[in-house]
């Protein structure tokens, strides 16, 4: 799986079977090779296209999405502005990567979400990334894209990834 950042709230997740793009309140799955129509998800529910599963959960004023492919689970928090409820946090288990908004949610609250979910990777996005990174004791790593698999997940500490 390869994850790259396209600016604002937009990520691109390339898998062996398809390409997932995110944009604030939506997740779109495109078929590998551009064959077939794109499938856009804008509401809570369970979806599967091209071997990619997407689980949408209602959060206050937004929908958050788990994108599951290649034995990895990526949580995309969109533009949530409040801490997810404890009930929702318990549903968001076994997250490998979390993309978290540091503007609408705030750096402190984003850190609290990360602490509750304990992912392997954190992908902060927004204008206040530096403030979030400064509050994280282990620093960050800057990359153009993140290539990962279940076998390459870090063992000891959650890594904060900042995209160029």
Task: Show where each model-derived region lies.
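Short, charged/polar "capping" segments at the starts of alpha-helices
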Residues: 35-38, 128-134
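Proline-aspartate-enriched helix->loop->beta-strand connector
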Residues: 95-100, 107-127
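Core dinuclear metal-dependent hydrolase active-site scaffold
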Residues: 1-27, 33-93, 105-109, 143-164
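Short beta->alpha linker loops
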Residues: 60, 127-128
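Short linear motifs at secondary-structure transitions and domain/linker junctions
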Residues: 72-76, 98-100, 135-141
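Short, aromatic/basic amphipathic alpha-helical patches
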Residues: 112-113, 130-142
């Amino acid at each position: 799986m390869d994850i790259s950042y396209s600016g604002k709230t937009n990520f691109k997740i390339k898998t062996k079977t398809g390409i997932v793009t995110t944009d604030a309140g939506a997740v779109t799955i495109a078929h590998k090779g551009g064959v077939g129509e794109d499938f856009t998800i804008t509401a809570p529910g369970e979806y599967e296209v091209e071997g990619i599963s997407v689980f949408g959960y209602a959060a206050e004023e937004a929908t958050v999405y788990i994108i599951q492919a290649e034995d990895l689970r990526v949580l995309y928090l969109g533009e949530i502005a409040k801490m997810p409820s404890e009930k929702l946090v318990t549903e968001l288990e076994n997250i490998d990567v979390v993309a978290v908004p540091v503007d609408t949610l705030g750096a402190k609250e984003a850190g609290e979400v990360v602490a509750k979910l304990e992912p392997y990777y954190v992908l902060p996005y927004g204008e206040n990334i530096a403030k979030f990174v400064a509050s994280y004791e282990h620093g960050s790593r800057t990359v153009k894209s993140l290539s990962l698999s279940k076998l390459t997940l870090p063992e000891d500490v959650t890594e904060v990834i900042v995209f160029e």
